[in-house]
Design a protein with these regions (language model features):
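A structured beta-alpha segment of the ubiquitous adenosine-cofactor-binding alpha/beta core
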Residues: 48-61, 228, 232-261
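N-terminal glycine-rich phosphate/adenylate-binding segment common to multiple enzyme folds
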Residues: 48-162, 269-273
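Glycine-rich phosphate/nucleotide-binding loop
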Residues: 255-354, 361-365
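Glycine-rich phosphate/diphosphate-binding loop of Rossmann-like nucleotide-binding domains
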Residues: 4-24, 28, 153-246
Length: 401
């Protein structure tokens, strides 16, 4: 059959086991059917080090140009990785770099298959976590003191006016932390969430702790409410969907009692924690989609999990691993589907959706990677290696094309 043509997307390669899987997916599930048109950036740690991390910035700028990108999982180096890879320095997370440049919101949604039941038995539909991927504790300045003394927060405006507040009079050693966010980033977060809710026709919840954080968290609450009332309420009413704000502790209680089927918007740290909680309760981080959406309509798709280091070391010793490729496949299908939507290329979008269906059908037939076998409640399960599993998905895909 003739290969499907497509518009250009940004391709960002990664590290370790996911880099190996990335190539398998392209070779077996994509290249035989689609004339892949990608602008390639190697975000593997060695090349990031070689370019002084300029490649991460270049990739983000390319996403702004082409509007769609797909990213492999990457290493965020710690001290041990600096030594292992003989790095020039401890480079920042490429995800953080890309998020800061795109000013985006990360939406993570579990991939549901019959036969894997959520730990929370009331959940029937996916719960999407919208995480504000900017600022707060991730951009905090921290200080450790071993002496008594006064800690102050000082803001000096451009005109030289100074505001000063005492944080605490320390009678002994202690720790300090100062964090920030910007109105413009919170506004972008709100717009991304409201637009995503409209696109997916789902209710939107937003939670923080404004009863305790009466300036910081309340600013988030007020900006969300103001933007909703002025720009989105009418469209929400038309679609019959709802936006509401609640405290984070109340939100947790509501989530556990709910049936699912909504978007839960969270501040940066809350979203980091709750996305792992939701993914684990639904099954696995390897069964989770992740897309970074910017308010001006740029999309970056990736797997929600890491580089699967333990499997990579075993792979280097010649062992065939059973690493789950589903989230990485869905990163590709998400990007191809979005490219198809933006370009009016129905053939490309249809292919992406058929590949997703082939993945689900393969698992529901009892063929899966080892990590899913322990969660499986369906027919008898067969644990396959990554390569075997991808080839089974290919067989299912061939039936659907």
């Amino acid at each position: 059959m003739e290969k499907i043509k497509m518009g250009r997307i940004v391709e960002m390669d990664g590290d370790e086991m996911t880099r190996i899987i990335w190539k398998m997916i392209k070779d077996e599930l994509l290249s035989p059917y689609v004339e892949l048109n990608t602008e390639y950036y190697d975000l593997g740690l060695p090349y990031r080090d070689e370019t002084d991390d300029q490649v991460s910035i270049d990739a983000a700028e390319a996403i702004k140009k082409y509007r769609v990108g797909v990213k492999c999982a990457t290493i965020t180096p710690n001290a041990q990785r600096v030594e292992e890879y003989k790095l020039k320095e401890m480079w920042k997370s490429p995800n953080g770099t890309i998020r800061a440049i795109l000013d985006g919101t990360v939406f993570r949604t579990p991939i549901l298959v019959s036969g894997i039941k959520p730990t929370v038995r009331t959940w029937e539909k996916p719960i999407t976590i919208a995480r504000h991927a900017y600022g707060d504790v991730y951009k905090a300045t921290e200080f450790r003191t071993t002496k008594p003394g006064k800690a102050e927060l000082v803001f000096t405006s451009e005109d030289g006016e100074e505001e000063r507040a005492t944080v605490y009079d320390f009678e002994c050693g202690g720790v300090l932390q100062a964090m920030y966010n910007k109105d413009s980033s919170i506004e972008s977060f709100a717009h991304s969430c409201f637009k995503f809710a409209i696109d997916t026709k789902q209710d939107l919840w937003f939670s923080s702790k404004d009863t305790i954080s009466k300036k910081y968290d309340q600013t988030f609450k007020l900006i969300f409410q103001d933007i909703f009332e002025k720009e989105y309420k009418e469209k929400f009413d038309e679609l019959g969907i709802e936006y509401f704000y609640t405290l984070i502790d109340d939100a947790v209680a509501r989530v556990i009692r709910s049936k699912g089927g909504y978007i839960w918007a969270c501040k940066n740290y809350d979203g980091d924690v709750m996305s792992d909680m939701v993914s684990t309760a639904f099954g696995s981080l390897a069964m989770m989609t992740s897309v970074l959406v910017s308010p001006d309509g740029n999309y970056e798709y990736e797997a929600a999990h890491g580089t699967v280091t333990r499997h990579y070391y075993r792979y280097l010793e010649g062992e065939k691993t059973s690493t789950n490729p589903i989230a990485t496949i869905f990163a590709w299908t998400g990007a191809l589907n979005k490219r198809g939507e933006l370009d009016g290329n129905k053939e490309l979008s249809d292919f992406a959706l058929k590949l997703e269906k082939a993945c689900i059908n393969t698992i529901e037939s009892g063929k899966m990677t080892k990590d899913l076998v322990g969660l499986w409640e369906g027919c008898e399960a067969t644990a396959l290696t990554t390569e075997e599993f991808i080839l089974e998905i290919k067989k299912e895909l061939e039936k659907l094309l």
